[in-house]
Structures are given as C-alpha cells and as structure tokens.
Amino acid sequence: MSKRRMSVGQQTWALLCKNCLKKWRMKRQTLLEWLFSFLLVLFLYLFFSNLHQVHDTPQMSSMDLGRVDSFNDTNYVIAFAPESKTTQEIMNKVASAPFLKGRTIMGWPDEKSMDELDLNYSIDAVRVIFTDTFSYHLKFSWGHRIPMMKEHRDHSAHCQAVNEKMKCEGSEFWEKGFVAFQAAINAAIIEIATNHSVMEQLMSVTGVHMKILPFVAQGGVATDFFIFFCIISFSTFIYYVSVNVTQERQYITSLMTMMGLRESAFWLSWGLMYAGFILIMATLMALIVKSAQIVVLTGFVMVFTLFLLYGLSLITLAFLMSVLIKKPFLTGLVVFLLIVFWGILGFPALYTRLPAFLEWTLCLLSPFAFTVGMAQLIHLDYDVNSNAHLDSSQNPYLIIATLFMLVFDTLLYLVLTLYFDKILPAEYGHRCSPLFFLKSCFWFQHGRANHVVLENETDSDPTPNDCFEPVSPEFCGKEAIRIKNLKKEYAGKCERVEALKGVVFDIYEGQITALLGHSGAGKTTLLNILSGLSVPTSGSVTVYNHTLSRMADIENISKFTGFCPQSNVQFGFLTVKENLRLFAKIKGILPHEVEKEVQRVVQELEMENIQDILAQNLSGGQNRKLTFGIAILGDPQVLLLDEPTAGLDPLSRHRIWNLLKEGKSDRVILFSTQFIDEADILADRKVFISNGKLKCAGSSLFLKKKWGIGYHLSLHLNERCDPESITSLVKQHISDAKLTAQSEEKLVYILPLERTNKFPELYRDLDRCSNQGIEDYGVSITTLNEVFLKLEGKSTIDESDIGIWGQLQTDGAKDIGSLVELEQVLSSFHETRKTISGVALWRQQVCAIAKVRFLKLKKERKSLWTILLLFGISFIPQLLEHLFYESYQKSYPWELSPNTYFLSPGQQPQDPLTHLLVINKTGSTIDNFLHSLRRQNIAIEVDAFGTRNGTDDPSYNGAIIVSGDEKDHRFSIACNTKRLNCFPVLLDVISNGLLGIFNSSEHIQTDRSTFFEEHMDYEYGYRSNTFFWIPMAASFTPYIAMSSIGDYKKKAHSQLRISGLYPSAYWFGQALVDVSLYFLILLLMQIMDYIFSPEEIIFIIQNLLIQILCSIGYVSSLVFLTYVISFIFRNGRKNSGIWSFFFLIVVIFSIVATDLNEYGFLGLFFGTMLIPPFTLIGSLFIFSEISPDSMDYLGASESEIVYLALLIPYLHFLIFLFILRCLEMNCRKKLMRKDPVFRISPRSNAIFPNPEEPEGEEEDIQMERMRTVNAMAVRDFDETPVIIASCLRKEYAGKKKNCFSKRKKKIATRNVSFCVKKGEVIGLLGHNGAGKSTTIKMITGDTKPTAGQVILKGSGGGEPLGFLGYCPQENALWPNLTVRQHLEVYAAVKGLRKGDAMIAITRLVDALKLQDQLKAPVKTLSEGIKRKLCFVLSILGNPSVVLLDEPSTGMDPEGQQQMWQVIRATFRNTERGALLTTHYMAEAEAVCDRVAIMVSGRLRCIGSIQHLKSKFGKDYLLEMKLKNLAQMEPLHAEILRLFPQAAQQERFSSLMVYKLPVEDVRPLSQAFFKLEIVKQSFDLEEYSLSQSTLEQVFLELSKEQELGDLEEDFDPSVKWKLLLQEEP
C-alpha cells in the first residue's frame, strides 16, 4: 500500500487544475459565460457613455427671483370646485390680485365635471380644488407650471446651466405662477377668516435662491439603470458557478470525500478560479464606471474594491445556495433572482436616508450592500466639494463600513455553507447534529487504542447452521471487517423501509468475498455503509479495528480503502490519465509518486491505448474500467467493489479477475455482482443476501452440493437419432435421471450428484452409440445461478445448454401456466385484425406523437419556468408604462408640509431636516410673528439683529427674512436649491404666521397636484410596446420546439423510426402541441398588451382577425424553423438559451435596420419577407403604415398589400416544411414505410459487390454462407428466413494522422453472411469493436452497408415489413411517461387499432406481470422493469423480425431468468426470428439456438452451443474437496499421474482445482472411472468434472482480435452503457 498524506494544498491545486481544464475543454459553456459578460460590459460602455449625463456644477452666488406678483402670464384660465358660497367668496377676492386682473375664473360643482375644460379650452387651465375653507390643492396639467418630480433625488441635478444661465427646478414654482396663485388664495382665505387684508403683504414677498455650492449630479433614470446592470454584472459567472458546484456536489463530491477529499479544498478550488474571473470583471466594471463618469470624485481603487468584494460575496452566496438547493438549474435561477431582488431592495438608498438599524441589517444581503455602496459613491459626488478628492483628503467612513459589510457577508455565507453542508441530510455521507460545533470532539482529536474490543466480539459470525460453511482454520484471526447486527432503514412513502435487517458476518483478509442477491436485497446499501458513504441505523462495523461510527476513524479508513461504486466516478472532460492523476492527489498519494502510481494502474488494466482519450468519449465498459482503476490507486488494503465489471466485455472482465486474484493476499476484497458466474469463478466465499438478511455463505462447491440440481448431460444429435431409445439408455444406468430439454438437435438430462459412480458405465455406452445419431455429448456441473434461484424459491432454467422447455416440464404449474399464457398472447396477434396503414395510420401516429409531446411538456418544469419568466420579462416595460400612465392620469396630491424640510421643536438633528432660519431686519421685535411660527410646530433659529443675509449659508433648507416695521411686515424667502418644494412650503408658513398674528387658530394647507391630458398621440407608444414584446415572443420558440433533440439523444426517435413511424407524422405531431402552445402564449401576450394599453392604442389595429391570422402563420413558420435547426444540430446540445438569444437579437436588429433603412416602406416589406423571426412585427408595421405612397411602391391596393403581408408567414412555413422534408430524405436512415405526406419511400435493397473474397474460413462459416445464398434464391416466401445478411461490409473514414496524410479506411465488418430462420434466436457475440453494433445498425437501417445486402422478411416479397421489433441496449424511453403511456404510443405508431392495442397490451402486461407498474413513470422503475418494458415494446404488434441488444443487461439473476424464459417463449415455434447480441455468455447459452462469434469484423464461428464447445473447447475443470488435509500432497501426485497435463488453478484449505486438457479427459467414461477410484482411495468429500464453458471458448477466439481494430471502441456511436441496479 502506497504511503498517503492528505494535504489541503495538494487537493486544492489538483481540483483547481481540474476546473481550469473544464473551462478550457468545455469551450461552448466558457464562451457563453464570458460572451454574455463582455456583451454586458460593451453595452454599458457604448450605451451609457453616450446616454449618461454628468452635471458638474460650480459654485454660484444667490439668485433673486423678484416679487410674487411679478408673474404676468395671461395664457390660462382658472377653475375651482366645488362651487359654494364660501369658495365663490374666496375666489372673488382672489380675482383682486394684481396679476389676475381680467382673468376668467369659473366655478364647477365637482372636480370630475372639470374634464370638460379640455374640450372647451385650448389654453392651460389652473384648477383649484377645495377640501375645506382652509385646505385646497392646486392642480396643473402634468409637466406644466410645476416640476414633474415630487421631490429632488439625492443624486439628480437640481440646477443646471440653460442658455448660459443657471436654472433651478425649484424656481418653476415662482416663475410660472404656482406661488402667485398660492399667495392670492391664502390672502383671500385670511381676509375672509380675520377681516384683515394681507394681499399686499403676500404679493410683495420676494424669493431668493441661496448660494449654490459646487456639486456633481447624475443623469436621473440612466444612473438607476446603470446601477441595476452593475448589480447583475456578475450574474453570468455566478449562475455557472452555482450550476457547476451543485452538479459536482450532487453526483461526485460525496464519493470524493469518502476517498479523503477535504471539504475546504473543494470550496477553495471553485472559489479561487471564479475569484480570478471576478477580478477581471471587477477591473472592467470599475473602468466603465470611471470612464462613463458614474462616479467622478472617488478613485479607481475604491470602486474596484467595491466590485471585487461584491463579486466574492456572490460566489459564497452561490456556494450557500448550492448546499440548500439540490437541483443545478434551480440553484442558478434562485441565486440570480436573489441578486436582482436584493439589489433592487437597495434602490431607496439612492433617494433617501434609510434608518441606520434597517440599513445595517439589510446589508447582510450583499446585493443590497453593494447598491448602498454605489449610492454612497454617487452621494459623495453630489455632496462633496468638487476640488476635494476622496482618496486624498476625505475619510470615507460610510464606504469603508459598506466594504466591511461585504467582507462580513462573504465570511458569513461561507460559514453558513460549511455549517449547512454538515447538518443537512444528503443521499450519501455522515450528517452532524445542528450543535456539532459545541462538542469537544469537533475541536480536538482524541487518541484511541490500537485495538477496539467490541462487546461479544467473538460472537460476530452468524449463528452456525448447515446454510453457512465453517471458515477454514487458516483464516481464524484474520477477520478484517467485522459486521455486527447491522441495520439500515430508509424513509418510504408510507412507512420505513428496512434495507438491512441485523446483518452479522466477518470478512477475512486473504479472501475474495462476493455479495450476491436480487435487486434490492441490500448489497449496495451494505457496501455504501462499509465505505462510509452511508450511516447505519443501528449496529456496528469495524475495519481493521477502526470503528465506522467515528469521524476520525472514517478518515483513517479512507486512507487504506478503495471503493468502486455502482455509478462511474470520473470527470468526462478529463482524459483517463488526468482522471487517475486527479484522484491520486485527492487520495493523498505523495506528489513524487503520483505519476508512477498512475502509470502502474494504466499498465495493469491495459489502458495505454486510451490513456489520452477524454472519459466522455470512452465506451461504457472503458469508463467502468477507469472507475475500477481509480479504486485501486494507492494499492489499498481494503477493496470494496460494487459490480466492478458491469458492462465490460469478457476479455476485459477476465483481466480484472486475474488482477484481483493476484492481489488478494494480505488484502480484503469484497464485491457485489449480478453476474453469478463472476462470483463462481472469482470469489473464494459467496455470501447470499435476501431482503436485507443473510441467507447462506460458503464456497462454490459447498453451495452447489447443498442446493445444486446435479450434472447436465447434453447430447448433440443428427436426424438418425431416436430420442426415446437414448432416454431409455440413460435411465437404464441412472433411473432418476430427468429429460429437461428436447429439440431436433439436442437432448439434455439432469443427472443427480450422488450418482457419479454410475457415470463411467453410462458414458461408455454413449461412446458406443455413435451409430444411433449421437454426434457429440458433454457434461457440466450445476451452476451458481441455479443455486441462487433455488435459494430465492424460483424455478430455474439451465444456462449451460439445457434449453428451457424440458426444464419447464419439471417445474411447478405456475411457471408453465405463465409461459403458456405468454405463448397464447403472442399467437393471438395473428388473430387480430390487420394493422392500419396509409393516411389513417399517419393520423393515428400524429395523435400519438402529440400525446407524447404534451405529456413531456407537462413534466418539463425547467422549460415551463423559463417560458413563464420570459413571459413576465416581456411585459415589464408595458407594466411600468401602465403604472406610469395610471399614476399620472389620476390626480395625486402632494402635501406641502414644513415637516418635510424643518425640524420640530426638541427633535434631534436629522438629515436632511434643519432649523428654519428667521432673520429680523425690521429694527424692532417680531415676537408675535415668531410665536405664530412656533405654533406651527417648527424649530426656528432667530437672528434677532439681522446680521446675516440668509442667502449665503446653504446649511439651512430655508430662511425667512422679515423687514418693514413692527406692524407692517415685509417678507423675503430664501430657499436651498436642493429642496424642490421649499418656496410653496415657506409661503404657507408665512401665511399661517400672519393668520396666527390675527389670533386665528386655523391652519392653511396647500397641496400640489396634477391631472393628465387625454389627447396624446399614441402611435409611437404602440410601436414602442410592440418593439419589446414581439421580439421577446420570438425568443420563446427554442424553449418550446426543440424537444426533438432530447428524443435523438435518448435514441427514442430512432426507436420510433424502426417501429414504423412516418417522419412527417413525427414533426406534425410535435407541431400540434408546440404550435398550439406558442399561439396561446402569443394570444395571451396580445391580450395583455390590450389590457395594459390605453383605449386609444387598441383602436389603431382596426382588424383583429387579420392580426390573429398573421399570428397563426408566424407561429407555424417559426416552430418549423426551429425544427429545422433542431434537426441540423440533433447530435449536439439543446442550447435553447443560445437560440432564444439569437432570435431576440435578430428581431431587434431587424427593427432597427428597417427603421433606419433609406427605402422606407419597401425596405420594411422586404425585411418582413426575408427575416422569418421579424415577420410578425414587420406585418403589423406594414398594416399600420399603409399609405398611398406605399401602394405606389408595390403597385397594389391596400387590401392586396394586407393579403400579401398576411401570406408571408405561411410562405415561410411551406419553405421550412420543404427543407425539413429534404433533410429527412437525405439523412440516410432507412424507412419502414412510405411516408404519405413527405412522399419519402423506403430505399430499395441495393446490392453492392464486396471487394474481398472470403479466405481461410471455417467450414461452419462456409456452410452458413451457402445457406444464405440458397435462401436468397428461394422464391417460396413462406420458406424465406426472417433475416438474411449477405456479404455485409462496412467501411468508415478513419482519422488523418496529419494534414498531409490520407484518411485510412476503418473496416468495421468484412463479408459477414448469416441468416435467421423462423422460430430461431441467433446470438451474435464479440469483443468490443468486433463489429456487432455495426451489423445491428445495418439491419435496422441506421447505417448503409458499403457492400452486401440485408433482406428482412416482408421486404423481399409478400406484404411490406412495416416495422421491426428492436430492444436496444440503452433504454430508449421517456423518463416522465408511464409504462401504459409507452405501450399505447408504440401500439399506435405500429398501426394497431385502439381495440386491438388494448387487448394486446392487457395480455402482455398480464403475462409479464407488469400490472403494478402500469401507472408508474419510467424514471421510478428498476432496471429490470425497464428492460422488460423495452422487450415488450419490441414484440408489440407481432413483428416478424426482432433485434435484441443486451436484453437482460443490468438485471439480477432472477430477472434474467424471467427474461430468458420470455424470449424463448416469444420465438419458439413461431413465424418470428431474432438476432441477439450480448456480452453475457450465460444469456447466449440460455436462449440462443445458435451462436455466431465475431472477431475483427469477421464471423469466426457459428453453430449450436454444444457444437462450439466440442469444437473449440480445450479444457475440462476438475474440483475436489478433501476431508483429510493430510491427503493433499498424495492426491496432487495422483492427479498428475492420471492426467499428466493437468494444471493446478487453486489450492487453499481443503479445495483443489485443476484444468484438464480435452485429450486427457476423453473418453469421459474413463475420466469418471479414474475419478471414482480416486474418490474411494482418498476419501474425497466431493468432486466435479465440468466441460469448458462458452465463455472460455469465446475468450480463446477473442485473443485473435487485432489491436488496430479496437479503434471502434473510441467511436462515440459504439458504447456499452453501464446499467445500474436500484437498491435501497
């Protein structure tokens, strides 16, 4: 075992390199990540550098605005309401004001009736609305006579230079009459209330703007938008880091942690890389901020620091969300929404001062803190003297506080990430209690004893009984893993599920132990517990005296443990060598030993030829080998392997077996498997688990003897043989022998184990019966498969050539009934009515595909959420405009209260409130006036001696300068230019002061208000709305109409084609749903547009029917355009987001281009014609811009132009439909039927001459080739084989070695000929790259043969074939559809009428016992049920040709047996035939009538199982178990004497295993005679002599595979998928 040292630094560097390689190799994702970020930067620079306005205002002296009555405008009328005696009296006195002489003043009964003013008067109307005698509000038309803003924002320009003069917004109140009207009305109210006239006093009030200090102001709304874009500037990076981290945590991080990965290394690796990205982006954003002068006075370093800290806080926020949310897309979406909403939450800080406590609390949300920081920088520009730069002279305490909060947020999010990562429940790993950090064991590592003694440790073995073989004495004291009363429970839907129920046993050093059991037995659960991935509910486990319940011990265990989980553990974007190097560093292998260790693993697993290939390009078997290689890195002392050879071809499987056998000394190896032969060959001890409990344990010989059914005698016959006489002969020697299988070519008997003494005489008589038709015979011992099934209480069939039907005669009636029922189901298909075809079938298929699309759409939450989000975004501008419209259309009052600007008495100083400065320049006291001011609840500061002028100190919001004499005061108002409503507020203060002097307790209150004029032109408004929502509508289609890419990836489209689907039916079925959904969305958008728009806008579109018809055509054309894109890029990624963005950009640029084009209407028309996404908005623009000039351009009338524009989208639809038809026709996939819409016919079976002549072929191959030639010549259709493959050859273009070399052709198959007869199943075997997959593809029509011909029953004569039955290796199923929905869809596609389909589905479901799964979605099914479903789909509709590719891969032995029974029942004595490919030799032996083995693209041999064993089998296997160990050496000498060429394979304890050449064994009678003598002489407990297995024959032939032909392994189209078992 290699020395290990876990180092956070080494692990962080390794993971950081991995992340960088991921970014480099996943160029599309990285490009998008950076592209969107740079586009944002570019947009901000180009847009805001021109749009953004910065007002740098120098210091200005005070400005005199003159007297109130200096207002002399005459272009207005005055209206007041309600008209009453009091209001009429007030307004009569108002008319006496000097500036109102001769003006019209009208009374109205109420405010609503004033709307008639807009109809009767074209001039401006001033509305006075009285609420009572002393309260009123002045209403002006919006944008007239008063500022549009209610109040100044803290960063906007309150004064600016206009025509070389300084103009302040607050002066509008003075200059445009508001203050004059206010003064007149106030004077009238005072006179009526007190009988004292103050008209002259108020008319003589003068206004002065205080001195203006220098300030820098931003350009209003543009600044707000810029800050919003700054808030989301890092969102692209943060989205991708959220997705990447969540994906890794979900799929692989737990396994890496089990290998020794430190959590801090994982977070650091991602944090450091994205911190670099943030650094670059922060630099760019700071440069943009400074260059666009968003921030003027603050230095670059401060701005950069703000952005950098904000970006870092977002990274840790993404980390936190990845822990709390388990789904990658949802994590990214939530983080983005949090950034947006928390950032927007900070916008009030731009306009007002927030309470300190609230601001500090909300700053715990980093986007809020960033927004506050940006607001502070802008306020500094607004408030600080322009000559005093922040970096040099100011201490930016507020900015530093904000930066501190961003640092605090970063640390807080990181701590919360680590905390929740430890306590939140996860699928794997140990979870801590919420208060784990309060325990001392968390902070201090306690020492431990070298040996932990368990209570009753010596009793940890299961209770001894006859089901458990006693452990050999030599292993006593070598207990490495001790398991005691282990239980594991999971939370089920209704109740707790027990996965393990008190498991007790030991695992020994120096032994290979196999865990066997059905799916769900608890094997994976046990291995996960032993590896530390899972925590047991109760019980204890020790591994070399380390207790798994202690975290410290788990870390120690990980140092000497290697784990190969059921799922592959590697990164697809890394090469084989890079994966090994990464995991070596994670495991803590010393840096100088990493390369040596990686090279060792590569060599031991013979991966030199794939070490530089990306893992994602490897086949499933090669990925499995890589996962095993990762497990053995560091030469671990304990190996835990969960199905380590699943998906491997036999040759690779044997390499791993040999590696494990060679390294088992001084090591502990525990593995689980569904491949029973693997356990039989490899494991020294087998442990059977059933439903979470141990059932038995022992060696193969022990288990076979106790639960085996005996020897299998297989006789290969010719036509002269009389089966009855042979059976009589066998029973003559062994009376209790049973005939278990009988066919024309084969008889199989079971001979009891205890009758081995009768074997010599039986075999001697069989040798003498060669003239009775026995060509050959063989014998094999019972298999562990049979033991397994017997333990499970199931019926068995033989894997070793027994055949199924004779065995069924010996099994219970239940299984016979089931299979008879299945045969009846399959035969009943012939009785059903003929399947439909032509247009009727096309309609049925369209409805079936539409059903699939609708059901998929219901479950595609990601797409639906995205569509909903886009729908919402598209109406944000309209919603804002609607709110704006509603806000200003309705009257809003704005109270002009002194509390807005001035402190109350006793109130603490609070920005922006100040004292009201009162300056007495009367030369006498003004106590009465001051007393009256104080009664208004205003804190005043009095300059009693008049030493100040009131205009040079802008630290006050306002000042009142009192002059005149003691009784007749004159007033001057000085206002701070930052306080917009200061003049009317102070005028009310003066008015109430005068009112108080006359001892009145009343209070005058003036409000400002506006009304909206309803005679605006909305044509531009309509186009601006349309400009936004229709481009957004175009971006919907990629999220709606690209689901076909998923069908191509899942191979569902290919499966549908093979099942007889018309290409046009597929696309029209998709369109039936997609077009409807898209049109519904478009219709909703139009309805929303009408709802949000003013009434005038609606009437611009005069013919709604035309718009709807145009929309239907537009929707159809855009959906089919997306179909064309999907078809072209069907082998790539979906990339809906990219295409959505592309459509959006195309439409926006088209709008801009048509608006700017110099050809006017003609350019708009041709733009609509040539740019499909622009068609709808172009048509609407055409309808709205039809004029005599445009009619002259086109030489058409208005109606003709409308109809022409209306036809454009339909023309596009037809064009894209035709393009789609051409693409389908040229895709080189063979159709099963003629398409009635696309008019595409199945290709004729063209014959291509083979350039190679067969040379040096075996006699069997030559005979098969002759059968093929004869079959092609037979004219009787009933005698034609169901599959004829004649001289098939397939060449692929190889890769160039360099730019100047020619492509070397890669030959996948060479002159392959065979035929499959009716009722026959032929097995096609071969090493990876031998050509099996290519042969299958040529038969299905996926690949066109270079030479040769394929003829399928139905395609050469008689009726058309219609469809094939195909059970692919990869489950081509839709995860969210149920079993019943799959069956109904495929029945419809294959042409079954609804009634026939229901009958067939019911019978098949009943026969295969799928009733309980009918309503279950496929994604919830076990692998075995999925394989059953794929098989049922392949035979549904009674196809004459069925192709089965690894039909039982991934199933447990029980499921495999059931599947094999079903396959045999399906094809026995029928008109159907099947071609089966498999890596599992037991499967071929169980179901195949004949087997063909391919080597290097050629058929190497073909024939029955027994024929191949006899012809190519070279060895017999002899196993012997001794009672007396002292006899071991003499026995060994005796075996070598009797069998001189015997080779000893295993020798430990009492078991001895030898390999005997065929020539030493033949005749069998002599061999058994010798062994019987040995049994008596040496007192053997038992022995067995068994013939070579098919697997051994295959391995011998596979050694001929040439290295150069292995290149097909690396072709992504040739992959073996690892099918996982689902266990609790």
Curated annotation (Swiss-Prot):
It comes from the Eukaryota. Glycans are attached at residues 120, 195, 949. ATP 1 binds at residues 517-524. The chain crosses the membrane at residues 31-51, 221-243, 269-289, 300-320, 329-349, 354-374, 398-418, 864-884, 1026-1046, 1065-1085, 1108-1128, 1136-1156, 1163-1183, 1200-1220. Pfam families: ABC2_membrane_3, ABC_tran. GO terms for cellular component: intracellular membrane-bounded organelle; membrane. One of its GO terms (biological process) is lipid transport. Residues 481-716, 1288-1521 form the ABC transporter domain. Its EC number is 7.6.2.-. Widely expressed with higher expression in heart. Its main location: membrane. GO terms for molecular function: ABC-type transporter activity; ATP binding; ATP hydrolysis activity; ATPase-coupled transmembrane transporter activity; lipid transporter activity. It is an enzyme of class 7 (translocase). ATP 2 binds at residues 1326-1333. Keywords: ATP-binding, Glycoprotein, Membrane, Nucleotide-binding, Repeat, Translocase, Transmembrane, Transmembrane helix, Transport. It is found in: Membrane. CDD domains: ABC_subfamily_A (cd03263). PROSITE patterns: ABC_TRANSPORTER_2 (PS50893). Belongs to the ABC transporter superfamily. ABCA family. PANTHER family: ATP-BINDING CASSETTE SUB-FAMILY A MEMBER 9, ATP-BINDING CASSETTE TRANSPORTER SUBFAMILY A ABCA. Transporter that may play a role in monocyte differentiation and lipid transport and homeostasis. This is ATP-binding cassette sub-family A member 9. The lineage of its organism: Eukaryota, Metazoa, Chordata, Craniata, Vertebrata.
